[in-house]
């Protein structure tokens, strides 16, 4: 474990954050214990202040997270102090905070930016590839949770093509545990080409084209077979450990089997559907504790009324999100404004990862969480998502 040299500042940092408005105004130098940047208090502008549950707080001008403290609090504004506060406040130390297994959609995303030498209304254009790396909802969530300090275990059956091996290499580079990742001839790899374009009037638009290695225009995915592969996977997994979370985003039978078995062992199950239109979707919901979806994919939430033991989250883009906890009513949380929107792809994945991270930071088992616990978690998740959209690519500033 990391030596706690500056433990005497832990409570003081919390007080300084709580009294953020007064503390920062009286300070000469400020620091952010999230991104560990140091800057003069004069760099904090009126646009950096935002309301929170206790009044007004300042968003770091470097990373847009509300983890700013000033030297008027009595805390030395030094990088080593900020780094220790980060580990203490965000629960990240030498030991990972939790274990999460993820089954579902893993792609190799190619991100392309289209340039128009004669302007967006002209006919000429050139495409520039700016990134190529693992994507897909499950792929992104695993990488993001690893960045939050989790032990993450992707479960994915990839083929042995160069692209399939690239996905595996990227997962490993992000710090994921690779014991449940395979690259075999009978596996599946899906390629996604995401092109950022402009309409003739200059407004942005995105085109997405799927395919698979070898030139096919169709996705190719391989999931666990429910009759034999899923039971074998659960047996192997639980012989080593029982994960704290199981995340899945595809309602195939194999994933339903894994969710059912792990939930009986105490794992918190998180399902992210792209639609709620089949019996399989509803079965996945019944097997899960947390269900998150967008208003674009799932506008009708009436199905949630049939369940009284879950957290439902519907994201609504810039308008924020709605949530329903157990048998409570649907409630709305406003969005976190961001005028510098570059790319909204992946914002939902940041929301998901931050929700899981926030639940672990809270310290209570999911079944004991109440609305007072959930609201700050969802607000923080929206802040991560809002920050992400200022960056190109689904992983934001991690890319």
Identify what each model region corresponds to.
Residues 38-40, 68:
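Short functional micro-motifs and their immediate structural scaffolds
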Residues 95-155, 163-169, 173:
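Glycine-rich phosphate/adenosyl-contacting loop at the front of the ribokinase-like
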Residues 25-30, 53-57:
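Short metal-coordination and nucleic-acid-contact micro-motifs, chiefly zinc-binding Cys/His arrays
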Residues 45-57, 74-77:
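Short linker/helix segments within small regulatory modules
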Residues 32-35, 60-63:
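Short cysteine-rich clusters marking metal-coordination/redox-active sites
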Residues 95-101, 303-399:
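Conserved phosphate-binding/catalytic region of the ribokinase-like
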Residues 243-307, 311, 320:
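Conserved beta-alpha-beta core of the PfkB/ribokinase-like small-molecule kinase fold
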Residues 121-124, 147-244:
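Conserved N-terminal subdomain of the carbohydrate kinase-like
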């Amino acid at each position: 474990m990391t030596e706690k040299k500056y433990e005497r500042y832990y409570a003081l940092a919390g007080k300084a954050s709580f009294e953020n408005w007064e503390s920062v105004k009286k300070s000469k130098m400020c620091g952010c214990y999230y991104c560990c940047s140091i800057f003069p208090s004069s760099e904090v502008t009126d646009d950096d202040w935002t309301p929170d549950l206790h009044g007004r707080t300042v968003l770091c001008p470097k990373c847009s997270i509300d983890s700013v403290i000033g030297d008027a609090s009595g805390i030395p504004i030094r990088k080593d102090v900020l780094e220790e506060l980060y580990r203490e406040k965000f629960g990240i130390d030498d030991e990972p905070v939790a274990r999460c297994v993820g089954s579902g959609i893993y792609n190799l995303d190619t991100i392309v930016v289209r340039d128009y030498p004669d302007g967006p209304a002209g006919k000429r254009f050139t495409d520039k590839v700016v990134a190529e790396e693992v994507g897909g909802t499950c792929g992104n969530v695993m990488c993001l949770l690893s960045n939050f300090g989790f032990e993450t275990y992707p479960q994915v059956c990839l083929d042995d093509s160069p692209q399939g091996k690239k996905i595996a290499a990227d997962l490993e580079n992000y710090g994921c545990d690779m014991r449940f990742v395979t690259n075999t001839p009978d596996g599946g790899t899906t390629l996604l080409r995401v092109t950022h374009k402009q309409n003739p009037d200059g407004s942005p638009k995105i085109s997405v084209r799927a395919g698979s290695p070898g030139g096919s225009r169709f996705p190719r995915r391989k999931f666990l077979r429910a009759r034999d592969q899923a039971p074998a996977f659960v047996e192997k997994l639980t012989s080593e450990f029982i994960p704290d979370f199981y995340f899945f985003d595809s309602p195939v039978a194999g994933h339903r089997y894994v969710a059912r078995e792990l939930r009986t062992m105490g794992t918190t199950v998180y399902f992210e559907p792209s639609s709620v239109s089949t019996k399989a979707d509803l079965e996945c919901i019944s097997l899960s504790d947390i269900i998150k979806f967008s208003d674009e994919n799932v506008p009708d939430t009436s199905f949630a009324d049939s369940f009284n033991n879950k957290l439902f989250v519907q994201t609504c883009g810039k308008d924020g999100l709605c949530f329903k906890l157990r048998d409570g009513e649907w409630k709305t949380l406003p969005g976190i404004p961001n005028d510098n929107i570059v790319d909204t792809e992946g914002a939902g994945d940041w929301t998901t990862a931050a929700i899981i991270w926030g639940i672990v930071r809270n310290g209570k088992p999911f079944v004991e969480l109440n609305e007072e616990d959930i609201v700050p978690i969802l607000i923080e998740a929206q802040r991560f998502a809002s920050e992400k959209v200022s960056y190109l690519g689904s992983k934001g500033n991690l890319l």
